[in-house]
Amino acid sequence: QLGKELYTAEKSDFDKGHMTKREDVQWGETLGIALNAANSTFYYTNAVPQHKDLNRDIWRSLEDYILHTETKQNELRICVFTGPVLSSSNPYFITPINGKQIQIPFLFWKVVVFQKEDGKLYRVGFMMNQNKLLQENNIIEVLETDDQIFNQFKDADTYQVNVSLIEEMTGLEIPNAIDSYNDTRNKKLVLKEIDIDPELESDSIEYQLGFIIENLNL
């Protein structure tokens, strides 16, 4: 597990992309439990190198949107799984670290499992690609691959995908649930800014985001 030496290296334009956000686990029966849970996210084992332009855009917004908008409006109880796709097809960082070439994951996934009013569990999957951004900024050495799965994600965007595709790419078995999205095509998500009611104070319990995500199926 690499730490500061990766994020301070020459040509490193990475954020420490938290897989699990502090806010997601900051809860518990006591304040101490909640604080310990929040602090548990500040380890390098919970961070992956993500290009700043992607980490701070729709990928970061996706979970906020689901938690604060969809969850609130539909009274959903959700559980989020997330991580990088680790593969021999991942490209090499242009700068050796400690004299070694380091592969950088360029695909990241997120699965949201939630319960609807019918009491049944549903799940949706998302995939994000940073390969194009890394290439354009000369951060990685281009690694050619004929892997058709990886080649589905050429743009630096976030897509809604079948959970089965995430399972195929990661080798993981996601908890079984009803798939809300069954299209075989990967659908690009679009972040659209909206106007926030100026009368709504920032400390209001009626938390409101300044954007919506179009093309999202839950």
Predicted regions mapped to residue ranges:
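Generic recognition of stable, solvent-exposed alpha-helical segments in well-folded globular domains
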Residues: 46, 61, 158-161
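Acidic/polar loop patches that form or flank catalytic/metal-binding clefts of enzymes
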Residues: 56-63, 175-179
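Short, glycine/acidic-rich hinge or "gate" loops at secondary-structure transitions
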Residues: 65-71
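A short secondary-structure junction signal
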Residues: 25-33, 60-65, 90-95, 125
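Betabetaalpha-Me/HNH-type nuclease active-site subdomain
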Residues: 1-59
